[in-house]
A protein has these predicted regions:
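Perimembrane helix-loop-helix junctions
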Residues: 326-359
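Membrane-helix boundary/interfacial segments in multi-pass membrane proteins
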Residues: 60-66, 157-167, 179-182, 203-204, ...
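Extracytoplasmic
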Residues: 174-175, 585-667
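Alpha-helical transmembrane segments at the extracellular/periplasmic loop-to-helix junctions
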Residues: 5-22, 220, 271-278, 446-509, ...
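Active-site lumenal/periplasmic loops and adjacent helix-entry segments of GT-C-fold
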Residues: 130-276, 296, 552, 609
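Membrane-embedded, hydrophobic transmembrane alpha-helices
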Residues: 1-131
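Signature aromatic-anchored transmembrane alpha helix within multi-pass, membrane-resident enzymes
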Residues: 352-362, 566-600
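Membrane-interface helix-loop-helix junctions at transmembrane boundaries of multi-pass membrane enzymes
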Residues: 128-135, 237-239, 294-303, 342-352, ...
Length: 795
């Protein structure tokens, strides 16, 4: 565990340096006098854009080298620091004394440490001044951030493998950057890959450790971005603490939501970029709200809100297109009631320019790469899937179509019965009435006209809207939250809507103009994202996979439900007791935490897609540390390739199985490590964690009882057993090795073949093969061979 804690600290340091410290030093003049919110938004977006542009720019001219990246980033940092006259004079004075022989090396180090200490003290004092009068607020926010990071990183300390299959793909793309190849698998937003690559180059942190921990650490950026947005749009600046506390403690009751929230544990592009959508909305709102006549920055041709909107938009594009789409809908929800302000001359033109600038900044490297012959990455075909109405891997379009067809068949059946019944009645009437043909023709014409009028009537349109609302409720609210919770959400939605309308009326009566109302914006956003989730069931294209919307929708729903409490906070702040508002927010956060425990709705532990035992990870680490670089080969399933790729070689167990049946088969490294699962693991099982009840509870497995997923929890792992009876059994052929291992029968056969091959090798060379590690689930054999006389590994 000590190793993983140290790796977590290294990743944390590298992340803070790259995301915040480096841009804070480089742009200290730009940031001087700015608020903490501005500093956060600036650093967290500009750093991403600079890293992405630098790495991809060098890659486009085939100059992407680790040493060059280090020279650029450290060089810019040193030059920026030395621009300070005091620091420059101190630096040159120290080194002049060192080279003159009047200053020893130890003294130089102590003096440099002293100067660094002075800088830290100065920074702390500056921070103290910035947070004056708000220390309790920031303390509560810090506790919430620490709790969030602890909750989402808990799994990485329990299971040291990647938690999601996509992470192996992203690792491969990052390794492509290490080899100097950008867009190694096709044109795709690479900002996250570039960021991890720079952490690896600048600090020597293994890519494996970066991907294992950075996503959980980056949750802090999401929490702060949500904090900044709702602190701005709510009438009370303390309501946002209730929103964050509810998001971090209240449980969920649907597998889509569990999946959506679990994704925050993984270092993958969409979740890495989620914070940018909230920053886009924040600075669009701030830009629309501003008063240009009193804005001093207008004279300079600069608007800080528009600048940060541009950088946030650009950052969302370079990280993941889904995030940009979500940012669009989030911004549209808030901007709807400020539409007249947007189309003002002083707003519309700058906004259009900002959007174009954001698009150009972010897409230029991708466009240039595509223009020079690099194809698009396969996952970008989602656009064509939307146009064609076909499913993505996570899509529900086909499911929705099947349900729609079933409903149509039921309706048609009912309609046929109704027609048959009406026909029987008409027959009886015709038997008892004698009518002329003229009357029949007239009656038919009247009926046709009535049918046409009914079809195009307002009543029909209203009925269509009502039907769609019912579908959104059924396949959105009720599906995600169950009937009881969905009922409460609808009540809060109506209440928030009423409060928003009331605010509009009061403001209009007082000032004779319509305000840019935020309560309605929050409510519209929560409803719009629910419509996006239920889109395929409404006959609309599924622009974003529903499960990926759940996390943002969860935050928006809590924000909407906090609107009535925001009104109460606002009224409380107008009284003489307003000075107790920070303590009231602290009490609210504590009450939510205690209440979720008391009412049994405290959130549960999340899951990883388990692909290997922890002992396998630890053994691989041991091999990496103790064996010479590239002088060993690990023969195992695919996962070890990514952990050891920077220092060793890897042979797929499936390839070993096939090649060992050839006439001759050698592996040209000094050390061979054979990994054998004595109990073959059920590949990609949903492994739920267990742990202390103050952090979370074990409660989510019950929601998977009707799914096909293989589940495990805590110390229990779903696995099988190797056997001699499985030798020479046929293996199911698959497209690639990793797919073969997901079939438990294949895995049993391959692990059995490997185990008994090692036993056979031991019979022939008893002193050459040794057990490197063994427990009840896993065994690792090692063979040391003479590279001049390699062993023939064929049967």
């Amino acid at each position: 565990m000590g190793y993983w804690i140290s790796e977590f600290v290294r990743v944390l340091f590298g992340y803070v340096f790259m995301m915040y410290l480096w841009p804070s030093v480089i742009f200290r003049k730009k940031l001087s006098g700015k608020s903490l919110t501005f500093r956060f938004a600036f650093c967290s977006t500009v750093s991403i854009l600079l890293v992405n542009t630098a790495v991809l720019g060098l890659g486009l001219v085939h100059m992407l080298k680790g040493w060059l990246i280090a020279c650029i980033f450290y060089g810019i940092l040193i030059i920026s620091v030395l621009k300070n006259k005091e620091l420059r004079a101190s630096f040159f004075l120290l080194f002049r004394a060192l080279f003159a022989g009047t200053l020893g090396g130890k003294t130089l180090i102590f003096r440099m440490i002293y100067n660094i200490k002075k800088c830290i003290i100065r920074t702390i004092r500056c921070l103290d001044k910035k947070t004056k009068g708000r220390k309790l607020e920031y303390s509560v926010l810090s506790v919430l951030i620490i709790f969030a990071v602890a909750y989402f990183s808990y799994g990485a300390f329990q299971c040291h493998s990647y938690g999601w299959g996509d992470m192996y793909v992203h690792h491969a793309w990052i390794y492509g950057l290490k080899e100097g190849k950008i867009f190694s698998e096709g044109v795709y937003p690479e900002a996250m890959h570039c960021f991890v690559y720079c952490m690896n180059v600048l600090f020597g942190i293994p890519v494996y450790s970066c991907l294992l921990f950075m996503g959980e650490i980056h949750v802090s950026a999401l929490i702060v971005a949500v904090y900044c947005l709702f602190r701005e749009v709510m009438k009370s600046k303390y309501t946002v603490y209730l929103i964050l506390a509810a998001f971090l403690t209240v449980d969920v009751v649907c597998v889509d939501e569990i999946y959506g929230i679990s994704r925050l544990q993984y270092t993958i592009p969409q979740e890495f970029g989620l914070y940018t959508q909230f920053l886009c909305a924040l600075y669009l709102i701030c830009f629309i709200r501003r008063n240009p006549k009193s804005d001093g920055e207008k004279k300079k041709g600069i608007d800080k809100n528009l600048f940060l909107f541009t950088t946030s938009l650009a950052a969302s594009i370079v990280i993941h297109f889904y995030v940009t789409i979500m940012a669009f809908f989030l911004c549209a929800s808030f901007a709807l009631l400020g539409i007249t302000r947007i189309f003002r001359k002083e707003n519309f033109r700058p906004l259009v320019v900002a959007v174009i600038a954001g698009g150009v900044i972010s897409t230029t490297p991708m466009i240039l790469a595509f223009a020079t012959g690099t194809p698009l990455q396969g996952s970008l075909n989602w656009g064509m899937n939307i146009i064609n109405g076909t499913d993505t891997k996570e899509g529900r379009t086909q499911v929705a179509q099947n349900i729609s067809e079933e409903n149509s068949e039921e309706e048609n059946s009912e309609e046929e019965n109704s027609i048959k019944k009406s026909t029987d009645i008409s027959s009886e009437i015709q038997e008892n009435q004698i009518t002329t043909s003229e009357n029949k023709d007239m009656t038919q014409q009247i009926e046709n006209n009535a049918a046409v009028q009914k079809h195009f009537s307002v009543k029909g349109m209203v009925q269509k809207i009502i039907d769609n609302i019912k579908l959104v409720y059924k396949y959105g609210y009720a599906q995600l939250y169950g009937e009881e919770r969905a009922g409460w959400i609808i009540r809060f939605t109506l209440l928030s809507l009423a409060l928003g309308v009331l605010n509009l009326i009061v403001y209009f009566i007082r000032l004779k103009k319509f305000p840019f109302e935020m309560y309605l914006g929050i409510t519209f956003a929560s409803v719009l994202f629910m419509i996006l989730y239920a889109a395929p069931f409404l006959g609309l294209p599924e622009i974003i996979a529903g499960a990926r919307l759940c996390l943002t929708e969860q935050i928006l729903l809590f924000a909407m439900m906090a609107v009535p409490f925001d009104g109460l906070f606002f009224l409380f702040e107008k009284t003489k007791a307003a000075r107790f508002s920070p303590f009231l927010s602290l009490l609210g956060v504590a009450s939510i935490y205690a209440g979720t425990h008391y009412f049994g709705i405290f959130h549960g532990y999340l899951y990883y897609e388990l692909t290997r035992y922890n002992s396998v990870v630890e053994v691989t680490n041991s091999i990496i540390e103790n064996c010479p670089k590239y002088q060993y080969t690990i023969i195992s399933t695919t996962e070890e390739l990514y952990q050891a790729i920077e220092s060793g070689r890897h042979e797929e167990i499936l390839d070993f199985y096939n090649r060992s049946k050839q006439e001759k088969y050698i592996i040209p490294t000094e050390y061979l490590f054979f990994y054998v699962e004595k109990k073959p693991i059920q590949y990609a099982q949903y492994h739920f964690f267990t742990g202390p009840r103050w952090l979370a509870q074990a409660k989510y497995t019950k929601f998977y009882k009707y799914s096909n997923a293989v589940l495990s929890e805590g110390d229990e792992i779903a696995n099988s057993q190797i056997s001699e009876f499985l030798l020479n059994e046929p293996i199911t052929i698959t497209g690639k090795a990793s797919d073969a291992y997901s079939n438990i029968k294949n895995r049993e056969i391959l692990e059995s073949e490997m185990y008994f091959w090692c036993q056979k090798f031991k019979m022939h060379f008893p002193n050459e093969i040794k057990v490197y590690y063994e427990d009840e689930d896993f065994i690792c054999y090692v063979v040391k061979q003479n590279t001049d006389h390699l062993y023939d590994l064929s049967d």
